[in-house]
Every structure is written in C-alpha cells, then in structure tokens.
Swiss-Prot record:
Source organism superkingdom: Bacteria
Pathway: Protein modification; protein lipoylation via endogenous pathway; protein N(6)-(lipoyl)lysine from octanoyl-[acyl-carrier-protein]: step 1/2
Keywords (A to Z) from UniProt: Acyltransferase, Cytoplasm, Transferase
One GO BP: protein modification process
Active site residues according to the UniProt entry: C169 (acyl-thioester intermediate)
Protein name listed in UniProt: Octanoyltransferase
Assigned protein family: Belongs to the LipB family.
Subcellular localization(s) per the UniProt record: Cytoplasm
Organism of derivation: Enterobacter sp. (strain 638)
Length: 213
C-alpha cells in the first residue's frame, strides 16, 4: 500500500479504554510501511489524567471514572458530543517535528471553526484552541518510535458541567466552551469529517480512504 496514504476510521461512541488499547497496539506493531491512520471517536464520560498529571487537579470526579493516560498534559474530560480525533502518524516519514504537529493540529481546529465564523486561536502558554479566554479544544500527544498517537478533543454539542469537577488541563477556573454556543445544529457527525479535511489540507492533501471501523 502506498505509504503516503492515510486511512480514516469512524469509530462512533466508544468506551475510552478499549480504543486507547487499540491505539497503543497499532503504534507498537506498526513498521515503516504501515499507512498512517486518523480515528474519529466520541467517548462515554471519562476523565483522563495525562502522564505528568497531578492528582490535585481532579477535584470531585463523582461517578465519572478517572483513567491514567500516557499522553502529554494534565487532566481533561471526554464525553458524548465531543469530537476526539486521534492522529496516528509516522512523523519521520512525513518529516514533521512534534512542535510542528502540535501547531498543525491547532491550525486544523482554527480552520474548522473559521468555516462557522468562530474566531479561534492557540495560546503560547497553554496548548489547545481558545475562543477569547474560553477553551474549546484540548490537545495531548505521545510520540513512540517516531510515531504520534493520542490527539485532540473538540467540544461541539455536549454537557460541559463535568469540566467543573476538574481543573481542566491543570488550570484552575479555566472556562470551557463549545461550538453549540455559536452553531446550534453542530454535531460530531458534521464536524468530524470537516476536521479531517482541514488536517489533510495542512498535510498537502495526501491520498486518503475512509474505511469501516
């Protein structure tokens, strides 16, 4: 298979742990000829704690499980109505540095939101994407064997209240927002493919294929 090709999988609504395990298995077993993949998924409610995450940032988890992750960053929340995009890229093959990939993912979200006239921006002091001072997208990556995994989570049409149970990404009082505030009918089903197309454009439009999960 042509190495530059990217396979795109729609996984729907899934528990966090099996998808995380599948992502690790994919990364551990891939070689120089394995095509890159992008996974679109929504997760059942879960807090994920980053590799350097501090327990004090998990305030009152209540009935939502807290799962340790090996991505960068602090604690965040995933739930239905949030589009998670995992980027499983061979950075060496694509001649991308880690910082370049972070910038590229942030720009992907900025470009996606611009389609709906939402003026968003990254911040030098806090990874992710913001509208004004409010965070709309979280970002966390891990690199192994020159390949990326984990990715981004864009708030679209969800219950934001669980974010009040944590210090999102380690910032006390960080206000979260979502696309629904500006676009009433936004859904992951609509926004997910747009995110993928914006990312592919920034990767110079490599060949890609949507495949069944």
């Amino acid at each position: 298979m042509y190495q530059d090709k990217i396979l795109v999988r729609h996984l729907g609504l899934q528990p966090y742990e099996p998808v995380s395990q599948a992502m690790h298995d994919f990364t551990d077993s891939r070689d120089d000829h394995t095509p890159d993949e992008i996974w679109l998924v929504e997760h059942h409610p879960v807090f994920t704690q980053g590799q350097a995450g501090k327990a004090e940032h998990v305030l009152v988890p209540g009935d939502i499980p807290v799962i340790q992750s090996d991505r960068g960053g602090q604690v965040t929340y995933h739930g239905p109505g949030q589009q998670v995009m995992y980027v499983l890229l061979n950075l060496k093959r694509r001649k991308l540095g880690v910082r370049e990939l972070v910038t590229l993912l942030e720009q992907t979200v900025v470009d996606t939101l611009a389609e709906y006239d939402i003026d968003a921006h990254p911040r030098a002091d806090a990874p992710g994407v913001y509208v004004g001072e409010m965070k709309i997208c979280s970002l966390g990556l891990r690199i192994r064997k020159g390949c990326s995994f984990h990715g981004l989570a864009l708030n679209i049409n969800m219950d934001l209240s669980p974010f009040l149970r944590i210090n999102p990404c380690g910032y006390a009082g960080m206000e979260m927002t979502q696309m629904r505030q500006w676009v009433e009918n936004a859904t992951p089903g609509i926004i997910g493919p747009l995110l993928v197309s914006k990312l592919l454009a920034l990767l110079n439009n490599p060949p890609h294929e949507y495949i069944p999960a």
